[in-house]
UniProtKB/Swiss-Prot annotation:
Specifically methylates the guanine in position 1207 of 16S rRNA in the 30S particle. It catalyses: guanosine(1207) in 16S rRNA + S-adenosyl-L-methionine = N(2)-methylguanosine(1207) in 16S rRNA + S-adenosyl-L-homocysteine + H(+). The keyword Cytoplasm applies. One of its GO terms (molecular function) is nucleic acid binding. Its EC number is 2.1.1.172. InterPro entries: DNA_methylase_N6_adenine_CS (IPR002052), Mtase_sm_N (IPR013675), rRNA_ssu_MeTfrase_C (IPR023543), RsmC/RlmG (IPR046977), SAM-dependent_MTases_sf (IPR029063), Small_mtfrase_dom (IPR007848). This is Ribosomal RNA small subunit methyltransferase C. CDD domains: AdoMet_MTases (cd02440). It holds the Pfam family MTS. It is found in: Cytoplasm. Monomer.
């Protein structure tokens, strides 16, 4: 089944006839493959590993190099990520580049007119399925350099660590209160192999490595910008660790003494429990004997019942009015 956005694009198949096409942004289906007979070449650029790993020939990366007759961009709720990717695409495209931008109204696609107005002509050409479709023609190329998009921050809790982050990464500009509470439970009793799952900019794994130098740190995420941020946070703070893409446990190698996470529960603009459900239900298969799963979550979320089902019991290591840190042992 194709997405609402792709259903709207199906109403405009003449745009694709005989053209090389680049799909980018928040694409989540196999619509590009259905165009194989119409288009001499199709490229897909995604920064989301949960999509990239399920499709063939997807370029999963922070930066993309390549051109096409037509670019199709799927708008997402993450405005910083959208701007970052669109500026990249415009900077390397030729004058006159044709771009279709499609997105759900609730994700803010209407703001594309203001976003792209400085760079060319944009017009809305369709409205259906609660989506808007826009046609853009490039007239004024922007300048793009990755180094200009890095943000950094420090925090008293982080003991002189500097956190590096790219656009679209969770808590990119400051330490969030949930992670801060989770960090308050980290002490020198932690040892062995540690997995920071859903690592974002690498705050948790880097902090553990700083406090417990002998810990073996692995950090994973589904977001290309998060992985690049975590690598830079480690390297700029002279810390060592593995960083790679995994959709929860899809690509996890080996077992761990501690799996620690501030797991996401927002998917775009919807609340989604898939990732944290997989984390809790599958963690025991990735923990060593007596290994621990430790997560922070909003206090209202129904995780205690899930933890009991799969680990018999749990402890609350720290809590505030909004967050709780849960711990279970294998």
């Amino acid at each position: 089944m194709i997405s609402l956005e792709s259903q709207v694009l199906e109403r405009h198949l003449s745009f694709f006839d005989g053209k090389s096409v680049l799909f980018a942004g928040g694409i989540s289906d196999n619509f590009p493959q259905t165009l194989a007979s119409k288009c001499p070449s199709i490229q897909i650029w995604s920064c989301h590993f949960d999509y990239a790993r399920t499709q063939s020939a997807v370029n999963f990366s922070v930066e993309f190099q390549g051109q096409a007759d037509l670019i199709v961009y799927y708008w997402t709720k993450n405005k910083q990520e959208v701007n970052f990717q669109l500026l990249q695409l415009l900077a390397q495209a030729p004058i006159g580049q044709e771009i279709l931008i499609i997105g759900e109204n609730r994700c803010g696609v209407r703001s594309v007119e203001k976003t792209l107005a400085p760079y060319g002509e944009i017009a809305k050409i369709d409205s259906a399925r609660r989506c808007g479709l826009y046609h853009f023609s490039l007239q004024n190329k922007p300048h793009f350099e990755l180094k200009n998009f890095w943000k950094t921050y420090q925090h008293s809790t982080l003991e002189n660590l500097t956190i590096y982050s790219l656009p679209g990464v969770f808590s990119a500009a400051e330490l969030d209160t949930g992670t801060e509470l989770l960090l308050s439970t980290i002490d020198n009793k932690i040892k062995g192999k540690v997995l920071d799952l859903g690592c974002g900019a690498g705050v948790i794994g880097s902090m553990i490595k700083k406090r417990v130098p002998n810990a073996q740190i692995t950090m994973t995420d589904i977001h290309a910008m998060a992985l690049e941020s975590a690598r830079k946070t480690l390297s700029e703070n002279q810390l060592q660790g593995k960083v790679y893409a995994s959709d929860v446990f899809s690509d996890i190698e080996g077992k761990f003494d501690l799996i620690i996470s501030n797991p996401p529960f927002h998917d775009g603009i919807d609340t989604a429990y898939r990732a944290v459900t997989e984390l809790i239900t599958q963690a025991k298969w990735h923990l060593n004997q007596y290994g621990e799963l430790r997560i922070v979550a909003n206090a209202f979320l129904p995780y205690p019942e899930l933890l009991r089902q799969h680990f018999n019991d749990y402890q609350v290591l720290a809590q505030t009015g909004k967050f709780k840190v849960y711990s279970v042992k294998n």
